[in-house]
Amino acid sequence: MDNRSVQIREALADGPLASEALRVRLQISRATLARALAHMPGEIVRIGAASATRYALLDRFRPLPEIAVYRVNTTGQIAPLGTLYPVRPDGFVMVQTDGATTHHEGLPWWLIDMRPQGFLGRAFAHRHAPSLGLPADVRHWSDTDALRAQLASGADPVGNVLLGEVARDHFVNAPAPQTCAPADYPRLAAQAISADATWSCAGGEQPKFCALSETGHVLVKFTAAEASPISTRWRDLLVAEHLALETLHGAGIAAARSRLLDVGTQRFLELERFDRVGLFGRRALISLASLDGEFVGNAAAPWPAITAQLAKLGVITPEAHDRSALLFAFGTLIGNTDMHAGNLSFISDSGQPYALSPAYDMLSMAFSPTSGGILRDSVATAHLHSVLDGATWRSALDLARGYVLRMSEEKQLSPSFKPCVEALGELQQAAAQNIAKLH
């Protein structure tokens, strides 16, 4: 039987096999296969049932345990969701508490957004990489590296899923979080900067931290404390983001609630976290990038091209697609050059089809400082993608004009941002002529 176990391990080393395929490969009977598998406790994970049964080999080469997966609901109650098993060669099998099983060739798509990334991800790596022997640059982390760090730290990631017993214990035993006042923000900003030694105010990424404000759980973006043309530009862009969100609110379009605060020499923009409900409640938050990777595979396409496919598949609601299209058109007409698939997300309390989350990261990023510190005050002509119809472009143009009007009247914008506002007006004037050609 030991020899048979070796044969099974070799057969499953390259990935799961159906029961019949495994039997044929080993040239044995069904009864012999069943007996052989029974002698391999703790090595095999069964996927599916009956004629659809497949078998996967647990991966003992990756330094990962069997991972308990928990989910927190909107009222703040935590419950087991299942167990995640690493299997050969690089995949995972999720065994839910109800017995359902799913094989993933890599990290399950619904966990991808939990990977540390961006400014906050680099700060996370700064804290945990040395003790775990991981690369200092979080961009070089494998899925295994990311999971190891989250399990060891008990990370509290975006969304409503927690991985491992450390995270579960942290959540259950945590006291009520303390509310932060605006006066605390400069200190929290300094801590955030010190945790990411690679950050520079020149470049297209805004530093941020998470906090509990008097209005609820927030993500807080901030500018550098030192006065400079670059920090002035970022101060203006925080105002621009606030005004874009206010413009959407004014039109009845869901967008993150925001608040501008000037404390000392710094400007802060509070943005509501819509994956948090009350003190402890949570809601699933899934990026377009994650959904595209699992269901479509066209990440370079504009948002509406991807969401149209997702709506057709029943992954998101038709309304989510329609609003995604409007937001993309609006972003195009206000110079938002950063509409990648990670900047659009979906929320859910009960699975598919997912609804679109409130809009976020919507601003005129065409005017953000370059990595070399150049301040741009021009914007490229708007490209009217064919995936959007004329009615959507016309609705977006009305919103975009309202946004520019708000900026032209906004006293918190610096004089140096005036050419940017004028450039947006010219962009919209040219776009209006082309939109008029659409039915």
Regions found by a protein language model. Name each.
Residues M1-V6, E10-A341, S345-H439:
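Phosphate/dinucleotide-binding and metal-coordinating scaffold of catalytic cores
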